[in-house]
């Protein structure tokens, strides 16, 4: 008797600057899925945050002009309906598992995870709270600091307090090399390296177009960029380390290097570091994974200063799966193939869903028989 295939909804797109990156990741994941195990339905979130039905999404996935297909789909939809952004989910047969490949907003900030939770369906990766905390650089740093995990010093600037943070104060507290970052953006979007007052003013103005919270971080001169992949739930494992070297003259691994022209970027797989540094980075990554409550997977980025001291940069709960993405490549050199990695991620999502299903959320679990009634011994 043939075993029933798992029906997987593969979601990509979204309203972030990483929309097209998401599409490339989704293609690679689809190609890596064992079609003897999985029936795969494609769904795309448009740049407006509207979920298209399977038919329109598949057309775009297969290469038809996105703008044209989206406009045709919109004409058939009641965009003013209360559930218009997710109504397309009702047009497909029962879904067993959700596999979001949505980078940035909607996908990594806890939004779609909340949707899957409401639908009572398993999904890949971290849950609502972990996704939200890991996507917000300010919240991430607060948790890392509480857990005693080394990261760069920073100041949080908001519209309410920005007048307090002049360039002279920034230099006094953080030094004369800083990075300005929107709190909730991925793929280095809106990030500026700053070492003059003029650059600082320009960077702040740009960063505030992406978020109402902006981080100003102390910079590290001539850092080595090292990454590590994590896989698992309660007992995660770590991959071998990978390294990134940007072209001479480029200041850091920015959006251009990641997705527009990566021809000059060198990926060291594995990167050669001494055993003590490798162990310290691995230990820091696993500790951060636990502190942030991550599940399934994460890619965690590090900067190593000229003295060989590692600083945890950023965690990524839904790392890229493009042709140059390091998350799957680091697992490949660690002995886990692309298709096996996808199988494991799906199984981890199912296991976490089953574990959460054992938890109690009713009043009896709190020692209360009914609302307003307290039980006394």
From Swiss-Prot:
Residues of the ATP-grasp domain: 141-347
Q: In which pathway does it act?
A: Cell wall biogenesis; peptidoglycan biosynthesis
- Residue sites binding Mg(2+) 1 per the record: 301, 314
| Cofactor binding notes | Binds 2 magnesium or manganese ions per subunit.
- Which catalytic reaction applies to this protein? 2 D-alanine + ATP = D-alanyl-D-alanine + ADP + phosphate + H(+)
Q: Which cofactor does it need?
A: Mg(2+); Mn(2+)
What GO CC terms are in its UniProt record?
cytosol
What are the GO MF terms of this UniProt record? Answer: ATP binding; D-alanine-D-alanine ligase activity; metal ion binding
**In which compartments does the protein localize?**
Cytoplasm
GO biological process, any? cell wall organization
Reading the lineage from the top rank, the first entry is: Bacteria
Q: Which Pfam families match?
A: Dala_Dala_lig_C (PF07478), Dala_Dala_lig_N (PF01820)
Query: E.C. number, please?
Result: 6.3.2.4
Q: Which residues bind Mg(2+) 2?
A: 314, 316
Keywords from the named record: ATP-binding, Cell shape, Cell wall biogenesis/degradation, Cytoplasm, Ligase, Magnesium, Manganese, Metal-binding, Nucleotide-binding, Peptidoglycan synthesis
Q: Which coarse location class applies to the principal site listed for this UniProt protein? A: cytoplasm
Q: Where does ATP bind?
A: 171-226
Role played? Cell wall formation.
According to its UniProt record, which protein family does this protein belong to? Belongs to the D-alanine--D-alanine ligase family.
Provide the protein name: D-alanine--D-alanine ligase
Question: Which organism is the protein's source?
Answer: Limosilactobacillus fermentum (strain NBRC 3956 / LMG 18251)
Lineage, highest ranks first: Bacteria, Bacillati, Bacillota, Bacilli, Lactobacillales
């Amino acid at each position: 008797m043939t075993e029933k295939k798992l029906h997987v909804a593969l979601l990509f797109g979204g309203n972030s600057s990483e929309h097209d990156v998401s599409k490339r990741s989704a293609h690679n994941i689809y190609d890596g899925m064992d079609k003897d195990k999985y029936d795969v339905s494609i769904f795309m979130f448009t740049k407006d945050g509207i979920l298209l039905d399977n038919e329109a999404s598949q057309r775009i996935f297969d290469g038809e002009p996105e703008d044209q297909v989206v406009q045709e789909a919109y004409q058939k939809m009641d965009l003013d309906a209360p559930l218009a952004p997710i109504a397309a989910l009702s047009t497909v047969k029962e879904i067993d598992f959700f596999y979001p490949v949505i980078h940035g907003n909607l996908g990594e900030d806890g939004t779609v995870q909340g949707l899957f939770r409401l639908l009572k369906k398993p999904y890949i990766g971290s849950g609502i709270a972990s996704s939200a905390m890991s996507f917000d650089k300010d919240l991430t740093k607060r948790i890392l600091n509480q857990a005693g995990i080394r990261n760069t010093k920073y100041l949080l600037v908001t519209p309410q307090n920005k007048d307090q943070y002049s360039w002279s104060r920034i230099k006094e507290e953080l030094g004369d090399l800083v990075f300005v970052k929107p709190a909730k953006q991925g793929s280095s979007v809106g990030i500026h390296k700053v070492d003059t007052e003029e650059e600082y003013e320009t960077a702040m103005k740009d960063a505030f177009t992406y978020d109402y919270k902006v981080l100003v971080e102390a910079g590290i001169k001539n850092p080595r960029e090292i990454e590590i992949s994590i896989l698992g739930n309660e007992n995660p494992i770590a991959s071998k380390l990978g390294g990134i070297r940007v072209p001479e003259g480029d200041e850091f691994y920015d959006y251009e290097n990641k997705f527009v022209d990566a021809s000059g970027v060198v990926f060291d797989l594995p990167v050669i570091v001494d055993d003590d540094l490798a162990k310290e980075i691995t230990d820091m990554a696993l500790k951060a994974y636990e502190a942030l409550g991550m599940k399934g997977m994460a890619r965690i980025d590090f900067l190593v200063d000229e003295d060989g001291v590692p600083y945890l940069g950023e965690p990524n709960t839904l790392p890229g799966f493009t042709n140059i993405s390091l998350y799957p490549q680091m697992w490949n050199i660690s002995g886990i193939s692309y298709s096996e990695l996808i199988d494991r991620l799906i199984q981890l999502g199912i296991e976490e869903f089953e574990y959460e299903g054992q938890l109690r959320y009713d009043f009896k679990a709190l020692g209360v028989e009914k609302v307003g009634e307290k039980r006394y011994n």
